[in-house]
Each structure stands twice: as structure tokens, then as C-alpha cells.
Design a protein with these regions (language model features):
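Gly/Ser-rich catalytic/binding loops embedded in alpha/beta enzyme cores
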Residues: 1-158, 264-265, 269, 462-464
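Acyltransferase
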Residues: 11, 41-44, 254-276, 301-308, ...
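Glycine-rich, small-residue loops and helix-cap segments
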Residues: 14, 57, 96, 147-150, ...
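Short helix-loop capping/hinge segments that flank enzyme active sites or metal/cofactor-binding pockets
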Residues: 55-77, 237, 292-340, 347, ...
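Glycine/threonine-rich flexible loop motifs
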Residues: 72-83, 252-253, 366-374
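Short glycine/serine-rich loop segments
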Residues: 87-213, 389-411
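A short helix-breaking turn/cap at a secondary-structure junction
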Residues: 175-257, 280, 344, 424, ...
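Compact nucleic-acid interaction/catalytic patches
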Residues: 454-480, 485
Length: 574
């Protein structure tokens, strides 16, 4: 429930904090205090009138390559700036649910870079270590979150811009599957691989924002909907891919120890580590900037090079975009074919695991180091991030403690549409509880009462395709439970009416394709049908034909399958 005046109070606190930290390089455009307070009052009035505003009391910073109505979009190039006709769908959806935009944030010019230092508005410094880079290109949005200026930072990610800054600021960065969040109203970098992302201090907050932004939008040809087989969560004991030691050679000794520590903690929580060959991933990542795909950057903003004087562009950005101008079409075709082969090899590596665990970046350089070698440092920073979008993966970057006095971060990645899986494993790292089941793809509710319960022999038929446990439930007091003959041991639930009892079970959300496979594989006497719960809800569940139960052992007095199994183990013999 939203507290009275939440939006107004949060806006006032945000502007106090902005004045306190005095970091003007974070912003390109900061809205006026009175204007934003007036908007907050309107949001509070809507909330008081009963409007559904889950983001009431949330303040938002938007990277300045994403359109916001009434504010100029510059992409950190003043000559390029324009006033958009309206907000990007991603922004509009957040505002509609109660979020308030404070302003537009600084970035590496045209979202070209991973350092946060390629901007005429100044290099954005790390929140906690001002001598070090913030990470880019979504520098301002990340630092705004890390400094507590805003609750959410809207960003973009082509090669790691929504993840590298998260690692350097000790915050969370979610990069959804490409196309789930509309990119309409976003200045393109490499349109085929661009993605709208979000920064927050927790996985829950970031995932809730992504859920609000997700969904096709008119005029956005790259939009994608959740497929029917999208997994709804990670299994209880996930298989986690980790790279061979050689692929981590660029890490310092202390960072390597920190990464190994994260992996060890996951094992202690029940995960299994599986070594994967990272070479096809790294090779795919190199294609993004060393290959012909960089031509997309020239297609997006190359006209700026021709129209404006050299001094209007950052030298590194200009060099990257200009080099893409003369790439021949046959090279793009060849690289597209090579990427397809590399994608096949990479996905084969992921076939045996639920997620891939990697350091987010190999180092955290100083501003001086970047100034001395801007292109070399930038390329190294993308070692573990540039392949994500070209291979069509989902990713969540999370903080993983402090090393050598600064934040260390890791990223959980998985194939497209496994967004809930990577978020669940990310929560294991941060220590957050299982997330809100409203985020992500929709699942079909299913009640299980026997061998499909958590930890029971047939539970894999739910967990393997990505079903998500909602929690324990009980049936209405109109069922009886019978122990059926055969292996594995399993019960049958029969509705009998007034002579019944309330039986314990679990409610799961199941991907539609997984439920169809369950139904196709069912054998008599079991079936799926409507089952009434003790709270009055009617939910699909496992039922049994009454005729088959007539010759089976009635175990209803135990109140559930697990209680019956426990009684069998404790019943004295002889």
C-alpha cells in the first residue's frame, strides 16, 4: 500500500541529496525542483484516489539517449540534440505507473564506450572512488542510483553499458532479452543489438521496473513477446556454467579469488558448477567492434560526422564511427554467417547448464589509465559483456562484495527469454528472497499434491522446463487422498464432497508448453482438472478417477502426501 504523500516526500529527499553530493557531471538536463514537485503532487493525488500506482514514490533518472517528453535528447552531443514529440514507451510506462523523472543523465557520446569518460559534459566519476571511472556508456544513470539520488536509472546496453557501470557502482543492472522492452524512442547505437536496461539497488526493484516496461509497442519492429516455453524460474539446484581458468587470466589475483568465492557460495546453496568453453562467446563478442557490425553505428549516427565539425565529437567516438563508414557489404554478410556459427557453438555450451556465471569486468581502471589508452582499456572492459547481445542472451549484473577497497561484480547470463532464471540465480548471490511472481512471462497455475511436490521423484517434470513454486496451499475440505499402487509411489486425489478433508499441496506456475507436455504424458487413473482450494479459488490440479481409488489405501487422515510418507518411515515394524 502506498503511503500518503510518498511521491512528494521522495522528490524532496532526492533534491536534498542532489545538492548534498554536488556531482553535476551526472546530469545533462536536471528538471526544476518546483516543476517536479508539482508532478509529484499529481501522482500523490492519483494514488489517494485509488489509482494502481506501484511505482508511486519512485524517482527515475533517464539516460540521455532515451526520449522524455519535454526534455531534449542529446546523446551527449549538443549539436545532435532535439526535442522529442513524446516519451519512449519504456519511459511512458514507468511514468504511467507512478514513477517521476528527475532528469536526463550523462553518457559516453552516442552510447559508444564502456568508460563513462567520453562526454563533452564531463567524465562521470565513480560514486565511491572519484579517481576511477564510473563505467559506461550508461554512466550518469548508474552513479545517480549509487549515490541515492534516484531509485531507478534507465539505461541502454549494446556491449555492456547496462552492466559494467553496475559492477563499478556496486548496484544491480538488468539487461533483458533483446526486444522485450521496446527500443522505440531510443537513439540507436547498433540497432540489431540495442536493449533498454535498468539500474537499481536490488534485483526486486530492477525486475519490477522491467516488468512494467515489457511488452510490444506500436512502431517498434524489433519487439518480441514471451514465448509459451519461457521458463518462469530457476530450478532449486541450478547447474551453473563457469569458464575454464584460462578465460579468467585477465583478472587480478584478488578479483579471481572473489569470483571463485561467489561460485563456492552458490555450490553451498545447492548449485552444481559445470565448466564451459568460453572461446565461442569471446569470439562472438569481438565481432561487435572488430567486425563489420560496427557499420550499424555509422548507419545510426554517421550523418553527424558529415554535418558537424570535428570538435563536436569525442575523438574516440569519432574514430569508431568513422572507421565503420567504408565497411563493404560482403564483409557484413561474412560476419553474419560467422556469428551464426559461433552462436551455435555458444548455445551448445549453454545446453547443459541453466546459467553462465562470469565477472562483469576484468578490472576497474582509473580515469588516468583511460586517458592514457582510451581504446585499449575500453576493449578490455568489454571482455565478458560484448557477446551477450550478439548471442541473444539475458543478463543480470549484481554486486558480489568489496575487493581491494572497491566493489566487485558478477553477471549471470542465459539464453534468450530465461530472464527469470538469471534473476533467481542473481538473488542467490545477493541474498534476496525469491522474487515477485508477477514479473516475467505469465504461467498457468497448477496444484500438485503428490509425486510432483518439491523434492519428490517427479518434481523434475516441473522444475526442468522452468515452473515456479508459488507456495503451499490446501484444498477445500471435499477431497480424499489415496495411495496408488506402482512405482514411483504416488497418491490420487478424489473429490467426494461432504465426506472429504482438506489436503496439503503446492501451487506452481507452469509454462504453457510444459503444462501441455504434462497433460500429454498423463496416464490413467490420473488426470488434470479443476480443483477447489480452501480459499475458494478454482485451480487446475492433479485428480484421480474414483474407480481406481476404490481399491487403494485411503490416507486422507494424514492430511497430505508428505505427512503420509513420514508416517510410513516412523511406523514400527514387527
Amino acid at each position: 500500500m502506498t503511503r500518503t504523500g510518498a511521491a512528494t516526500a521522495r522528490v524532496q529527499a532526492a533534491y536534498r541529496r542532489i545538492a548534498e553530493v554536488d556531482r553535476p557531471e551526472v546530469w545533462i538536463t536536471l528538471r526544476g525542483h518546483d516543476e517536479v514537485l508539482a508532478e509529484a503532487a499529481l501522482v500523490d493525488a492519483r494514488a489517494a484516489a485509488g489509482a494502481d500506482l506501484p511505482l508511486c514514490g519512485t524517482v527515475l533518472a533517464v539516460k540521455d539517449n532515451i526520449d522524455v517528453a519535454g526534455l531534449p535528447t542529446t546523446a551527449a552531443c549538443p549539436s545532435f540534440g532535439y526535442l522529442p514529440e513524446g516519451s519512449a514507451p519504456a519511459v511512458a510506462r514507468l511514468v504511467e505507473r507512478g514513477a517521476i523523472v528527475l532528469g536526463k543523465t550523462n553518457l559516453d557520446q552516442f552510447a559508444t564506450g564502456l568508460t563513462g569518460s567520453r562526454s563533452p559534459y564531463g567524465a562521470v566519476r565513480c560514486a565511491a572512488h572519484p579517481d576511477r571511472i564510473s563505467g559506461g556508456s550508461s554512466s550518469g544513470s548508474a552513479v545517480a542510483v549509487a549515490l541515492g539520488l534516484v531509485d531507478l536509472g534507465l539505461a541502454t546496453d549494446t556491449a555492456g553499458s547496462g552492466r559494467v557501470p553496475a559492477a563499478f557502482q556496486g548496484i544491480v543492472g538488468i539487461k533483458p532479452t533483446i526486444g522485450l522492452v521496446p527500443t522505440a524512442g531510443v537513439v540507436p547505437a547498433c540497432r540489431s543489438f540495442d536493449c533498454v536496461t535498468v539500474f537499481a539497488t536490488t534485483v526486486d526493484a530492477a525486475e519490477a521496473a522491467v516488468a512494467v516496461m515489457t511488452g510490444p509497442a506500436p512502431g517498434d519492429p524489433s519487439g518480441r513477446a514471451w514465448p509459451a516455453d519461457a521458463p518462469l524460474g530457476a530450478p532449486g539446484k541450478p547447474r551453473i556454467g563457469v569458464p575454464a581458468p584460462a578465460a579468467l587470466a585477465e583478472l587480478s589475483v584478488s578479483w579471481r579469488a572473489a569470483f571463485d568465492g561467489v561460485a563456492a557460495r552458490l555450490v553451498a546453496l545447492g548449485a552444481e558448477l559445470v565448466q564451459v568453453d568460453l572461446e565461442p562467446f569471446l569470439a562472438a563478442g569481438r565481432l561487435l567492434y572488430r567486425g563489420a557490425f560496427v557499420a550499424e553505428r555509422y548507419a545510426a549516427v554517421g550523418a553527424v560526422l558529415e554535418r558537424y565539425p570535428r570538435e563536436h565529437l569525442d575523438p574516440s567516438v569519432r574514430a569508431i564511427i568513422a572507421a565503420a563508414r567504408d565497411i563493404p557489404a560482403h564483409r557484413l554478410v561474412a560476419d553474419t554467417e560467422r556469428l551464426a556459427r559461433l552462436r551455435g557453438r555458444a548455445l551448445a555450451q549453454l545446453a547443459g547448464v541453466d546459467v553462465l556465471l562470469l565477472p562483469t569486468a576484468p578490472e576497474h581502471p582509473t580515469l588516468a589509465a583511460v586517458a592514457a589508452d582510451p581504446l585499449g582499456v575500453n576493449e578490455r572492459l568489454g571482455t565478458y559483456t560484448t557477446f551477450t547481445n550478439v548471442l541473444d542472451l539475458a543478463a543480470v549484473a549484481v554486486p558480489a562484495g568489496e575487493v581491494d577497497g572497491g566493489p566487485f561484480g558478477v553477471t549471470v547470463q542465459a539464453r534468450a527469454f530465461a530472464d527469470r532464471v538469471v534473476a533467481d540465480v542473481a538473488r542467490l548471490i545477493t541474498g534476496e528472497p525469491t522474487g515477485n511472481t508477477d514479473a516475467g512471462p505469465a504461467g498457468l497455475p497448477l496444484v500438485v499434491v503428490g509425486a510432483h511436490l518439491s523434492g519428490e521423484p517427479l518434481n523434475g517434470e516441473l522444475s526442468r522446463p522452468g515452473a515456479r513454486l508459488v507456495g503451499p496451499v490446501r484444498t477445500a475440505a471435499e477431497y480424499r487422498l489415496f495411495a496408488l499402487p506402482g512405482t514411483p509411489a504416488r497418491p490420487g486425489l478424489v473429490r467426494v464432497g461432504a465426506d472429504g478433508r482438506s489436503i496439503a499441496g503446492e501451487l506452481w506456475l507452469v509454462p504453457p508448453t510444459a503444462l501441455a507436455e504434462l497433460l500429454a504424458g498423463l496416464r490413467a487413473p490420473l488426470s488434470l482438472g479443476p480443483l477447489r482450494l480452501d480459499d475458494g479459488r478454482s485451480v487446475t490440479g492433479f485428480l484421480c478417477q474414483p474407480l481406481a481409488a476404490s481399491a487403494a489405501l485411503d490416507i486422507s487422515e494424514h492430511g497430505g502426501w508428505r505427512a503420509y510418507l513420514t508416517s510410513c518411515q516412523t511406523t514400527p515394524t514387527g
